[in-house]
Every structure is written in C-alpha cells, then in structure tokens.
C-alpha cells in the first residue's frame, strides 16, 4: 500500500493534485481543505499522505494533508454503502 508520496507538486485544483515523484506523475483525489493546505504548483519536496483504494474496476489514490483527515477517510470507508 502507498501511504505517502514526496515530490514536486505539478498542479492543484479543489479536487485533484498531481505530484511528480522521480518522473512519475501521481494523480491524487483530494478534499478542498487539503487543496488549501498544499503549497503552490512547482514546489519541490512536498509530502502528501495517501490512501490507495482498489475496487473491482478501478484503482484510485487519495491524498491528505493530515493524519486526522486520512483517519476520517478510513472511518467513512468502513461504513457499508459509503
């Protein structure tokens, strides 16, 4: 499981960040609060906590600015139907 990534922030929108880690671009689904906490695009050495979600038909990577936000995400995912 990928639990964090460190690299250069390529772009940030209110819902998606792209982080370049040694030439590989990772698209991360993020919340508005994480987007607000991230530095401007182009910043190097940015660490983002992550959670990978693997489903039957997709693999998604989500990014978080704090451990608390990631823990809340984990608790929400544990609820059936969410």
Could you tell me what each predicted segment is?
Residues 1:
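Extended, charged alpha/beta regions that create polyanion-binding interfaces
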Residues 4-6, 13-82:
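Long, highly charged, low-complexity intrinsically disordered interaction regions
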């Amino acid at each position: 499981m990928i639990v964090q990534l460190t690299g250069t922030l390529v772009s940030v929108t209110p819902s998606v960040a792209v982080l370049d880690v040694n030439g590989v671009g990772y698209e991360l689904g993020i919340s508005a609060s994480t987007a607000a906490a991230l530095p401007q695009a182009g910043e190097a050495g940015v660490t983002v906590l992550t959670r990978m979600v693997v489903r039957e038909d997709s693999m998604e990577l989500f990014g978080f600015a704090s451990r608390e936000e990631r823990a809340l995400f984990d608790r929400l995912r544990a609820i059936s139907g969410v």
